Amino acid sequence: MAKGPFHFKSFSVEQDGAAMKVGMDGMVLGSWTDVNGVDLAIDIGAGNGYVGLMLLQRMAQGTKVYGVELEHDAAQQCIENLSNQPFAGRTAEGWSGPVQRFHLEKPELVGMADLIVSNPPFYKNKPKSQDNARNLARHDDTLTMGDLAQSAHRLLKPGGRLCTIWPSDRLEEWESWSSGIGFDACRTVHIKTMRHLPEKRFLSEWRKQPCAPESNVQETLILEGSATLDFTDQYLAFIQPYLRGT
């Protein structure tokens, strides 16, 4: 993705200050997540804030999104992008700092969120670059699975949902952490970037109370056919409200 502003159909985000730009993982998470009945959503590891804005676009009037970001430059960009959101009757606010302290700075939000989303720094024990900001955005040294699950459980109200995206090789680890904290699995979507390739990512939705007996629903999402940008109808159905040219 380009380093300059990224223009969605209904909003734009500045991203020159964020180590990680608008990308497919966040696009999939933001378009897939259900916002029905959501009054308060929190995006953990928000980067430049675009996932939160994707949610806000579909949320009702009177609702709010918070974006929580640790890395300083990305957090400032998140604060700017969320404060400039164009959706009437809705509000958005960025917050700079570690999510492990968010509940201390915002105690009024403990147990109040209907939805938490996260496209977290999900690489564990992988080679790092010389760019510290990029390492913060990609590696889990400062936000482990346990940190994320515990923070989300603290901030969500009973019945609140946690939606995330992870590499496929961390599925069992995430299931162990989430169920151990007290979440119940509702939906899992296994993502293939192309039909002929193995699964690369998975989306998961967990609820802070038991899900329906027929859960956990297992699905597969294929992003592209046999060529780059040959988007499948399945993927286009998700991204058409957002991505120009679709």
Region annotations inferred by a language model:
Residues M1-V35:
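Class I SAM-dependent transferase core
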Residues S10, G62, G89-T91, G159, ...:
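A generic structural signal for alpha->beta connector loops
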Residues A18, T142-E199:
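Conserved Class I SAM-dependent methyltransferase catalytic core
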Residues P120-D147:
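Mobile active-site "lid"/loop adjacent to the S-adenosyl-L-methionine
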Residues P198-T246:
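SAM/dcSAM-binding transferase cores
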